[in-house]
């Protein structure tokens, strides 16, 4: 039984060849030089932007709701959020394909690319930069932040003083 299984497996493996034998380095070079497909065949031209773009107003609103100050580089934040939205839409698009195929599956805007040039690293922060940012922080009453001093936190400020009623 094992011999039959081995011989049939060997026949399956050795009998089906997709490519011809490449014996010389010239044959290998010429084989690899031939282009059999193009990535442009996989991509369709944009059929209209069905995905929502993250606008600078949305970024400012999200920063305010999260309690962060407006950033100077909100274009980079907008770009990063758009990339994240592309990834999320791509993930949900693939999830929905199991139930019903999506119309925008091959839309150029919906393809998430992870390229090093798209995600350039920012300058690292050092201790001096962090201390400078901390010293420049001011409480923002619109966020519910209240300014106080250390004397406001002393133990005496939490003691209830009882006074006698004088008639």
Curated annotation (Swiss-Prot):
One of the entry's Gene Ontology molecular-function terms is: glutaminyl-tRNA synthase (glutamine-hydrolyzing) activity
Subcellular localization is given as: Mitochondrion inner membrane
Which reactions are catalysed by this chain? L-glutamyl-tRNA(Gln) + L-glutamine + ATP + H2O = L-glutaminyl-tRNA(Gln) + L-glutamate + ADP + phosphate + H(+)
Q: Name one GO biological process term.
A: mitochondrial translation
E.C. designation(s): 6.3.5.-
In the bilayer, the protein is annotated as:
Peripheral membrane protein
Q: Which Pfam families match?
A: GatF
Boundaries of the annotated transit peptide in chain numbering? 1-19
Q: What is its main location?
A: mitochondrion
Give the keywords, sorted.
ATP-binding, Ligase, Membrane, Mitochondrion, Mitochondrion inner membrane, Nucleotide-binding, Protein biosynthesis, Transit peptide
* InterPro entries the UniProt entry points to: GatF (IPR027499)
Q: Would you name any one GO CC term?
A: glutamyl-tRNA(Gln) amidotransferase complex
Superkingdom, taxonomy of origin: Eukaryota
Protein function: Allows the formation of correctly charged Gln-tRNA(Gln) through the transamidation of misacylated Glu-tRNA(Gln) in the mitochondria. The reaction takes place in the presence of glutamine and ATP through an activated gamma-phospho-Glu-tRNA(Gln). Required for proper protein synthesis within the mitochondrion.
The family annotation for this protein states: Belongs to the GatF family.
* Subunit note: Subunit of the heterotrimeric GatFAB amidotransferase (AdT) complex, composed of A, B and F subunits.
Question: What is the protein's name according to its record?
Answer: Glutamyl-tRNA(Gln) amidotransferase subunit F, mitochondrial
Organism, scientific name: Candida dubliniensis (strain CD36 / ATCC MYA-646 / CBS 7987 / NCPF 3949 / NRRL Y-17841) (Yeast)
